[in-house]
């Protein structure tokens, strides 16, 4: 029997795998999953933002900064641009203007995107308001697919669907922040401290084969569109895609694998009636939901047939989140998945034979 054990960044252990009998050459094979949640960065926290990036070489990179200020009436007051590289958090003095002294404003900032005239198309829109700015969204390119969230090219679109820029610096992630209820100083000069956060979630897979070989793996059902500033909801017209399988070289199929993926936030209804890890299966996913999941394909020692193990991601940072499968931006998810022969003949609905 095969066992797949999984751990996410949080803190308790759950070794409740149940297995599915499958006739396979020499007898019954059963596959099982164990989920141990571990340490997650909770929503609302903004610590350690510089380590949560695409490439270690560029992990501190913040440049090409656009800062847009909106007044209390929701209309744009000013747009600032700086091409220089800065630390995170970044403190700057904004000359908003003495005519706005005492006014309460909202400040948006987006980094590692475009150049000075990136918002030129928006400048010509008569209803260029704070509401419209909240509709800015990132999209993956049609040619690169969802893997371009972590590499390749992404696109920035306006709420109305205008392509504002192509983001070519894949190793420096799109970083954003938003400051609300900022009061403009009497002289119009207002100091703002911008703490940027990455515009995607990092999912790290640790795959540990025991008495089996891992042939390939991938992350599936990833949103292709994500709001930049309006967090906590999917873009209404969102589509979903799968990262292509990562093929494991034959010499490494029995070794531990560690691989990071970058995805957009993904909000879905909770898993129906889930009380244990094995309930986080396809049969319990609400109709119309598109939760993100990982697929692992392996071959047990002594067999030739391939088996697929699917686990739904998100939540599981504690046992009381067992029904929760949203992928949120301000968390890092790390999963430890142990796949091994077990032999007790019980069944796991997350495992199937590859036909």
Whereabouts are the PLM-identified features?
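Bacterial signal peptide processing site
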Residues: 12-15
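Tryptophan-paired
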Residues: 50-134, 193-196, 202-331
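C-terminal motif of bacterial Sec signal peptides marking the signal peptidase cleavage site
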Residues: 7-10
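Extracellular beta-sheet/turn segments enriched in Thr/Pro/Gly and aliphatic residues
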Residues: 130-197, 206-208, 319-355
């Amino acid at each position: 029997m095969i066992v797949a054990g999984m751990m996410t960044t949080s803190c308790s252990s759950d070794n409740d795998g149940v297995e599915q009998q499958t006739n396979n050459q020499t007898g019954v094979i059963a596959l099982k999953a164990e989920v141990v949640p571990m340490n997650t960065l909770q929503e609302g926290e903004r610590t350690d933002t510089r380590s949560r990036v695409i490439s270690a070489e560029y992990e501190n990179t913040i440049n090409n900064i656009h800062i847009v200020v909106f007044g209390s009436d929701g209309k744009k007051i000013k747009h600032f641009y700086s091409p220089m590289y800065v630390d995170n958090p970044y403190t700057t003095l904004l000359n908003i203007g003495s005519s706005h002294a005492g006014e309460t404003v909202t400040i948006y900032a987006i980094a590692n995107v475009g150049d000075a005239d990136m918002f030129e198309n928006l400048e010509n829109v008569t209803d260029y308001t704070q509401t419209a700015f909240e509709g800015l969204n990132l999209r993956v390119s049609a040619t690169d697919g969802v893997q371009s969230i972590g590499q390749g090219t992404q696109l920035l679109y306006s709420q109305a669907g205008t392509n504002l820029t192509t983001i070519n610096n894949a190793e420096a992630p799109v970083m954003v922040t938003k400051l609300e209820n900022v009061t403009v100083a009497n002289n119009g000069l207002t100091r703002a401290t911008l703490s940027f956060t990455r515009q995607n979630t990092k999912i790290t897979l640790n795959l540990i084969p025991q008495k089996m070989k891992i042939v390939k793996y991938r992350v599936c059902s990833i949103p292709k569109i994500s709001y930049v500033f309006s967090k906590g909801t999917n873009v209404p017209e969102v589509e979903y895609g799968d990262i292509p399988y990562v093929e494991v070289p034959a010499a490494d199929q029995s070794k531990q694998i560690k691989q990071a993926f970058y995805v957009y936030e993904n909000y879905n209804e909770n898993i129906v009636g889930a009380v244990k890890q094995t309930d986080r299966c396809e049969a319990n996913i609400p109709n119309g939901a598109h939760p993100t999941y990982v697929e692992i394909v392996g071959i047990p020692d002594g067999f030739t047939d391939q088996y697929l193990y699917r686990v739904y991601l998100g939540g599981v940072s504690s046992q009381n989140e067992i029904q929760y499968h949203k992928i949120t931006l301000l968390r890092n998810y790390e999963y430890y998945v142990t796949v091994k022969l077990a032999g007790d003949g019980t069944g796991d609905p997350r495992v199937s034979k590859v036909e």
